[in-house]
Amino acid sequence: CATNKDINASLLDTFIRRIPVKIYLPSLEDRFIEERLTLIERFIKDESLRLDKPVLVSKNSMIALLSYNCPYNVGQLKSDIKLAVANAYSDYFIHHKKQIKINSPDLQKDIKSSLLSPKEDALRLVDLMADTDGYFCYVNYDKYKNYSRALKFLLNYKTYLKEEVLWI
């Protein structure tokens, strides 16, 4: 089971004896910054796919996401990104903006506070990344969505034609 608690305190001894393999997965703090970036990008692209729109992330927001202390690891990181995207989408929808942009105000307070003392690795990594007007763009459209609609239409039309031929 995935936990950051002491397994001896939470699992029965008999259960532990029957499954003798222990796997150690490092926390986000113990991983390389590039791996954290990969996770952040994956979660933002997942939200982009869900919304069917590109999501842009400001440089400061990316630095904050790369720098903040995330005690509940990957699950918390994913939840925090979902909340940031939801806040950005709300701003996009209410103010009729052209794009969904994650800016510092869309982040939770503890994430924003990491901007006061960002990690050096995060600053270097963000400087190396290609951006457009201070934003990183993440798009993850279902490129086959429109094709599948057309295919369904053609299959239905083919069935319709077969039925018409049978009735003649």
Task: Name each region found by the language model.
Residues 92-108:
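Flexible, glycine/charge-rich interdomain/linker segments that couple
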Residues 10-29:
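A short helix-turn-beta junction within AAA+ P-loop NTPase domains corresponding to the substrate/partner-engaging
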Residues 105-167:
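C-terminal engagement/docking regions of AAA+ P-loop ATPases
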Residues 1-4:
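Structural recognition of the conserved hydrophobic beta-strand(s) that form the central parallel beta-sheet
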Residues 8-13, 33-37, 41, 59-62, ...:
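Amphipathic alpha-helical transducer elements in NTP-driven molecular machines
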Residues 6, 17-18, 22, 35-51:
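Conserved AAA+ ATPase "sensor/coupling" helix adjacent to the nucleotide-binding pocket
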Residues 63-66, 75-93:
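C-terminal helical "lid" of AAA+/P-loop NTPase domains
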Residues 53-70, 96-99:
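Short conserved motifs of the RecA-like P-loop NTPase core
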